[in-house]
Amino acid sequence: MMNEPSIRQAFADAERVDLALVGLGELTVGSSLVRCGYLTRVQLRELKDKGAVGEVLMSFYDARGAPVRASFHDRVVSIGLERVSRLPMVIAVAFGRSKLGAIRGALCGGFIQGLVTDRDTAERLLEGVPSRLGGKGNQGRARAGESQQG
């Protein structure tokens, strides 16, 4: 398949990308990968058993952002997590409680530099993060823009 000119050209073009807008996928039976048939429930179970929490461009990763290689890896056509992590700017789009693990893993892995999300997801991501690092610390979920007395 990699000998196909159009695929070869797409991969060559990917080498010149300096900004990527990507989605982060969660690994649940309700995920679009499973619903659309790109991933079977058996493959999903294999990934989860290996510690995978999310995916970007069909590249799977664990809670630390480390790649998780599945038995079907060689049948996936993707630029891969290694290449994604070398891109100068990767902005991820992900929101909702089901995506928290995928977002945290991507942030820990350092392969995204920006995140587009909703307020509730952002606040949940900041729970437990010390306030000196921009989090809410142990003060609970404050509304964005409200000052906290204490």
Feature locations, PLM:
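Conserved phosphate- and dinucleotide-binding cores of soluble alpha/beta proteins
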Residues: 1-137, 141, 150
